[in-house]
Amino acid sequence: MPKIIAAKTIVTCPGRNFVTLKIMTDEGVYGLGDATLNGRELAVEAYLTQHVIPCLIGRDAHQIEDIWQYLYRGCYWRRGPVTMAAIAAVDTALWDIKGKIAGLPVYQLLGGACRVGVMVYGHANGETIDETLDNAAVYAQQGYKAIRLQTGVPGMSGTYGVSKDKFFYEPADSDLPKETIWSTERYLRSTPALFEAARERLGDDLHLLHDVHHRLTPIEAARLGKDLEPYRLFWMEDATPAENQASFRLIRQHTTTPLAVGEIFNSIWDCKQLIEEQLIDYIRATVVHAGGITHLKKLASFADLHHVRTGCHGATDLSPVCMGAALHFDLSIPNFGVQEYMRHTPETDAVFPHAYTFKDGMLHPGDAPGLGVDIDEDLAAKYPYQRAYLPIARRLDGSMHDW
């Protein structure tokens, strides 16, 4: 058996902060796992260092399920974003080790490929509708079949999804939370115009997506979904805060626009009702936030029973280690829908060399043993941690709103 003899965390900031767990075995094989929790990275790093790593030493690295249960049930204070990100890092690293020892890519260990590649969607955004659609046209020319559209809301600077750079979006970029303003009324008036213009310019063949980012009440979300029906969206994401899962029932009753939610979910219990009652069409839980490949595979199987497909979160707050793991997962499940894909900075790609490649609107994880993603520790050390917060939002009257 490959025995775990050491493990360590690597914190680096090649454009944004990432926490990577490296697990070493007595056979000389190591595995990597992503433990990044956007804006709270050091909390997970401390949890791993102080509470998880000491419990791993001497264990059989092949016993992935048992180690997962040990870390989940054994901590008593189960679930939550910090605990589940730490468990995810361990789980992902163990799958990486297992694949390397077997000489197989992880997707082969998960049952083999169900498709030739993983359809991904890019992010097109801009201060104006024309600017957003100009950027969308670039993605279409690059071969993307699915594109998320976000645009500025008139009279509101710093709207969610509008980046400072044309294609790189890093919202966690300030030493203290940046304050933005929000008006639901202006947003509801302007958003349908974006998609009307998009269909006129981009045609009917592209899949179009939109992220509300938890900002609407259920009835407001129902109204927006109804207004967007003529433009046949692939999905409307995070239409309302999902703490109350039953709130999606009201939205579902009023619109046929497909609904997606789940990037902030940490376990199957956060979305059990949503899936069981078919209140959503896509579940967006991802490897690093939902306990790793082991738990996400179970969640996807449960979703498959209820005709819910996956659409894993894949923004740049996840490192290439997580993206690689997500692609192996995506390739292996029958109910895959789409994978979010935001390109990392060149500095990040240099720190995390990877085997996955893009072609014709799809990513493929490659056939290197394990995850096919590595880390250059010397280069990572040149990019020290930098504290960074996500923005916050206030309504026009000064009260707090969901960002």
Swiss-Prot record:
An example molecular function term from Gene Ontology annotations: mannonate dehydratase activity
Annotated positions binding Mg(2+): 211, 237, 263
SMART domains: MR_MLE (SM00922)
InterPro entries: D-mannonate_dehydratase-like, D-mannonate_dehydratase_GalD, DgoD-like, Enolase-like_C_sf, Enolase-like_N, Enolase_C-like, MAND, Mandel_Rmase/mucon_lact_enz_CS
List of catalytic residues: 160 (proton donor/acceptor), 213 (proton donor/acceptor)
Catalytic activity entry: D-mannonate = 2-dehydro-3-deoxy-D-gluconate + H2O
Cofactor remark from the record: Binds 1 Mg(2+) ion per subunit.
Keywords annotated in UniProt: Carbohydrate metabolism, Lyase, Magnesium, Metal-binding
Binding residues annotated for substrate, in chain numbering: 38, 123, 263, 284, 313, 317, 340
Biochemical pathway: Carbohydrate metabolism; pentose and glucuronate interconversion
EC number: 4.2.1.8
Cofactor(s) it depends on: Mg(2+)
GO biological process: amino acid catabolic process; carbohydrate catabolic process
Function statement: Catalyzes the dehydration of D-mannonate. Has no detectable activity with a panel of 70 other acid sugars (in vitro).
Family as reported in the entry's similarity comment: Belongs to the mandelate racemase/muconate lactonizing enzyme family. GalD subfamily.
NCBIfam families attached to this UniProt entry: ManoateDhtManD (NF043051), PRK15072.1 (NF011654)
Protein name: D-mannonate dehydratase CC2812
